[in-house]
């Protein structure tokens, strides 16, 4: 997690937006659970994982679109063959992923990332809470 936020900070210092994908809910059999994160940079490279395979590919595409459009979104993925919205995985579950566009020009974003890194450096228990009610909340 620390490396992910360090890389996010580097992107922001270069003036580049990025997308942070976070699994916020999972049900049934899924490769990763809630709290798993992946950073996708403007050039399409990624750090972290939200499960690999088809779900990670779809999340990466959604992240690249978020960086391009500068908008966050909430996406649901079905990992069960034959169900509506099936993406071709056979795990048997469902995941909900919050794709959060991180704008380098957002007031206070650098300070927030610095706070996250300082908490991670001392290994304190903490929560990073996202407001999902407004797509451009962060």
Identify the residue ranges that each predicted region occupies.
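Segments forming oxygen-rich coordination pockets for charged ligands
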Residues: 1-138
């Amino acid at each position: 997690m620390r490396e992910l936020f360090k890389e996010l900070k580097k992107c922001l210092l270069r003036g580049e937006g990025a997308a942070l994908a976070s699994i916020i809910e999972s049900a049934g059999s899924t490769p990763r659970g809630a709290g798993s994160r992946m950073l996708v940079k403007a050039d399409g490279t990624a750090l972290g994982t939200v499960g690999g395979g088809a779900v990670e590919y779809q999340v990466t595409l959604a992240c690249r679109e978020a960086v391009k459009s500068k908008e966050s979104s909430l996406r649901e993925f079905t990992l069960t063959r034959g169900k509506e919205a099936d993406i071709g995985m056979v795990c048997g579950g469902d995941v909900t992923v919050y794709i959060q566009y991180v704008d380098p020009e957002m007031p206070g974003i650098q300070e927030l990332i610095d706070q996250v890194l300082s908490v991670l450096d001392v290994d304190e228990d903490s929560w990073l809470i996202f407001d999902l009610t407004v797509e451009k909340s962060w």
